[in-house]
Amino acid sequence: GAETFIRILQAFGKDTFIRDSYNWGSTKRGVLSSLLHACHPLPTDTSENLKKLAKQAEISDERLVEAAMFAPQWIELTEKAIGWKGLTSAAYYFHAHTNETCDDKKKAIIARYTPIDVDDLREGAFDIDWFKDAFKTIGKQRFEVVYNAAKYISCSNSHTRARKFADATNGAVKAADIKKEIIAKRNKDLLMSYGLIPLGRKPDKELLDRYQYLQKFLKESKEFGAQRQESEKKAVNIALQNLARN
């Protein structure tokens, strides 16, 4: 319940949560991370009560968002408690665009915001309309808080894909710079984000240039083994779909 949730956050102090359950162990942070992950709202918990408890414990709105990203069962109640309209949508944008597994409850919530299948999202498909709506609703400053808290979603770095997609869609990166990185690293997440960067003054030319580059990337993949070829082919197909959505 909410009282336990807040007590756990008090016990954490300024310590960070441990994402990987294999590393929880018997340390203070490990035990508290395990407890936070397992803590669920009670049917009797209200947003008003959570707000009151957090205020009494001097837990900031930003810390509540971090905790809710780590333990997503608290996202919706947290949105109401702190009054951040659009938090649930923004938070689940990040959850949906990692390659972590989703339970039925999470799938149902994601389905409220996008018609794209959860498995396709996990593979790298991107709903640009969902992202833009979530970003506009929550606002740039609060979105940055969610963006930074996304590190608590997974035990790997799979949350970085959602960040790359966000940076691309917001024009925080340049197509030429991303292209250089793709050439240097053949990073599939960057490849899939490449088509999401806003088109410039000559959209038709840029669209063609990006399409041709994706085809070139696909052709180059024939230099590698069968498994890598298949993986890169899938990434190119998704990149083309994302380009078409731009």
Task: Locate predicted features.
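Non-catalytic protein-protein interaction scaffold segments in large eukaryotic complex-forming proteins
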Residues: G1-D103
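General structural signal for secondary-structure boundaries
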Residues: T4, G13, K174-A175, N246
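Extended alpha-helical scaffolding segments
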Residues: I18, I183-N246
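Extended, well-ordered protein cores
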Residues: A57-E58, E62-K202, E206
